[in-house]
Amino acid sequence: EACSVTTATTKEYVTFDGLKLSVKIAGKGRPFLFLHGLCGDALQPLELFPDDAGWQCHALESRGHGGSDIGDMRELSIRRLAEDATAYLESLDRGAAVIGGVSMGAAIALRLTAYRPELAAGLVLGRPAWVDQPAPANLAPHRQIARDLGQHDPGTARRMFEESAMAKTI
């Protein structure tokens, strides 16, 4: 049986810069930090995590996702999200945890583990957003949308993308 948001407890974690991040915790046992993908929330990892596995799932909602504050949008990066996850793990004071993620969460988990290996008892990567390339072709629409949003209001950026040749390919 999978963990569910209805049985998980919710707590707030406050980052070094004062943002409130939502964390949903389910299960009992050793800590497993499980991170969601882009535009996801705690439901994504909790649905995948078995209830009776002997682990305690910590589903940290990244900045701007789920119940978490967004903060300065210029600070949204895999580096910053990994720093948030690192600080959260350290706040648990329970030693090394298994760290995992889905898609964007996998990228965050990989960065956290690469820079702070002593915090990782294991690493689980599900559907990583990228593996061996810093900017694979399948993420080109995301880059285009980000550029358009950086230069135009959201409505104009949306229209521009919808009318683009790239949008017609997806």
Predicted regions: what they are:
Residues 12-69:
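Conserved HGGG/HGGXW glycine-rich cap/lid loop of the alpha/beta-hydrolase fold
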Residues 31, 56, 95-98, 119-122:
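Structural signature of beta-strand start/N-cap positions in the alpha/beta core
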Residues 36, 97, 101-106:
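Conserved alpha/beta-hydrolase "nucleophile elbow" surrounding the catalytic nucleophile
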Residues 58-98:
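Active-site loop/oxyanion-hole signature of alpha/beta-hydrolase fold enzymes
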Residues 107-115, 120-150:
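Flexible "cap/lid" loop of the alpha/beta hydrolase fold
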Residues 135-139, 150-170:
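Conserved alpha/beta-hydrolase catalytic His-Asp/Glu region
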